Amino acid sequence: MNQEVKQSEVNLEQHTPMMQQYLRIKAQHPNELVFYRMGDFYELFYEDARKAAKLLDVTLTARGKSNGEPIPMAGVPYHAAENYLAKLVKLGVSVAICEQIGDPATTKGPVERKVMRVVTPGTVSDEALLDEHRDNWLVAISAHESQFGIACLDMGSGRFSVFEIEGEDALISEIERLRPAEILAPDLLTLPPGVRNKAGYRGRPEWEFDIESGLRSLCAHFATKDLDGFGCRGLTVALGAAGCLYAYAKETQRTELSHIASLVVENPDNTVSLDAATRRNLELDINLNGSEENTLFSVLNTTATAMGGRLLRRWINTPLRDLHTLHSRQSAIAALLENYRFEQVQQELKHIGDLERILGRIALRSARPRDLTRLLNSLAIYPQLQPLLKSAECETLATLASEINEFPGLVQELDKALVENPPVVIREGGVIAEGYDEELDELRGISTNAGEFLVKLETQERERTGLNTLKVGYNRVHGYFIEISKSQAEKAPAEYIRRQTLKNAERFITPELKTFEDKALSAKSRALSREKALYEQLIEKLNEHLRELQISAVAVAELDVLNTFAERAHALKLVKPEFRGEAGIEIEKGRHPVVEQVLTDPFIPNDLTLNAQQRMLIITGPNMGGKSTYMRQTALIVLLAQVGSYVPAEACRLGLVDRIFTRIGSSDDLAGGRSTFMVEMTETANILNNATSDSLVLMDEIGRGTSTYDGLSLAWACVEHLAEKLKSFTLFATHYFEITALPAQLPTVKNVHLDATEYQDNIVFLHNIQAGPASKSYGLQVAKLAGIPGAVLRQAKDVLHKLETGKPESPAPVASRSSKPSMQADMFAEPQPSKVEKRLATVIPDDLSPRQALELVYELKKLI
């Protein structure tokens, strides 16, 4: 807590009762901004006010004094609070929402207030605060030595999972995969900067990660003796992380977490490992600029539902090594392609809302009326999906059909209970339909019939009193009244009681009108209370079916993704990959799924073969010739196959890979103090230390960040290690043409190159993969395309000619440049004999006399 509040707490009597109440509440929430409800505003005080004014761009004012100094204050209107909360959550700031729970009209002193919820980046469930296209992960991390336990919770859907991994590299990879909104970790745990510096990082006390405490709290939640039924036997640190995460979730939500119905234990051995560099380089769902444009996800995502889009993103980031699941997904895609069934399914899915998050809000008792309307409309679609799935004669789709259960009772109940277009919130009523509840209809009838009563009373009183200016009215301040003009006011009957004097009229009340007023106003209040009670009963009734509804929502999301795969297979001309028992990758006319969609010209497809006899391809060719595209398309085709999708090729046969590694592109890490070359070597080290014979490795331009000798030596050694020791399936792109000599020594290494041709001093890229090494790099032609000045190109051409003809003496200097370019010998070029060597080659030592030998020494000395 800030120092000001701490000082103030010592002398609470110096403050007003209201501020004393605030300070006590703030003391319980030192790490959150406290939104303190005062009438129509949420107010913030002291350092909270200063911080909010800066982050939210609201006015910083003052209220009263503390120790003689004005108390800083800022506020936001309660009706617009969601917008401000959304901004704070995106900035990684947590907020405690303190509401008035007492009645100001009947309370002496400060109105009773209580923190009703704590909004944190990882625990939000409100629709306005969430990105519908992304999971919102709350992650807890615990550790013992080099082992990390990770627990993940998506509060919106109730998805809860745990797993254990080894080493910091694996931890960074998982954080990159999950991209959590909030991270909980022990205060004293040392974590990599890439984890600890994330927005939303929260240090927590060590005791919150106690394994035994975590186990007890989770068993209590799931009402089980142990967690073996969830597959948790053998887990240790992950249970400590899960216990902390669960306690934190309960603390922030202030209600039961009934939508957390299961705990999933993820097994890293069942998935393809993708490190952080690979996810970045392959641009799976975020491109190198940080947006979704031109990513694999953007090309594949034609899902009809928000929850389907989120599941697609998870699948893309978690390719599988489970053949049963992959074959199951493939069979569903094939069935949905039959007779264009996917088109009919997609039309129905478009009417289904974000059920996962709607059900999460229902469980947390924070669902709004329109959530229930969307649920009703979604459940009404289920019967239309059933025949489409059951007629497919596909086991996978039949299973989904059984899980997408029909809920006729709930549909009928919701349809009867809700008006067609309910208001956003229940606060003002108007949500429950007429005819649903007799008591509510009666109370509403009193208010509705008030107009008729007033007209009737006005007519009656005019006739009885003979006062033609008499009229009956109502306003919120004074309630119901009888108004008579000044000129006739003195003739008012004795039973008329004066209520208000106006400039031109007097207003009265009568015992009869007062009785009606009490009844009408009471009826309105009672009707609103009754409506809120009925709404809460609806929520409870839905919670009774929560688990079945959640299962159906998960099945709908899976159907949506499989249907999207079918639609994409049809639209993009994708084919079903064939999985084989033996290791290897064979692709016929493969295409890059993203680049193909961006190009205006036809994409040039290429073949690829990697097997036991050919485990590595050394790829040479000009820059812009397509080396990186060819490498990335191979990785994306393999990844798509192991997601269960069809792939962009004419045919694809492969064995399962366990990991995909990429070392492509150049970037530094200035924040971490690492140069471009250091980043390159760190990524290379990760590959060499972790790749296996079942891994796919892409390495591009290893060694270019240092001198020619160092770089070439490193590249050479990497090729040998990958080919001879690791035996990984490798695509190795390089500009070191000396590397192309290695296939002569390493039988499983082959040369290929990207074809190009030269026409009138210009380069034409053919983008075709050909056997053998490239004949030249076309570097000067690419430089010309890039706009390098002509004078520089002419000088470079002169230098190149002298180097290629074996005359590395300095070329004539350019007028504007007096320094001579330094030349570096080709490490593996055939050495040219010197004059001394040539002279010695003609000498027969045994034929020389001592004098001739001495003369030869003098002769050779002159040649040096």
Curated annotation (Swiss-Prot):
Belongs to the DNA mismatch repair MutS family. The lineage of its organism: Bacteria, Pseudomonadati, Pseudomonadota, Gammaproteobacteria, Cellvibrionales. GO terms for biological process: mismatch repair. It comes from Teredinibacter turnerae (strain ATCC 39867 / T7901). It comes from the Bacteria. Signal peptide: none annotated. ATP binds at residues 621-628. This is DNA mismatch repair protein MutS. One of its GO terms (molecular function) is damaged DNA binding. Keywords: ATP-binding, DNA damage, DNA repair, DNA-binding, Nucleotide-binding. This protein is involved in the repair of mismatches in DNA. It is possible that it carries out the mismatch recognition step. This protein has a weak ATPase activity. One of its GO terms (cellular component) is cytosol. The keyword Phosphoprotein does not apply. Residues 804-833 are annotated as: Disordered.
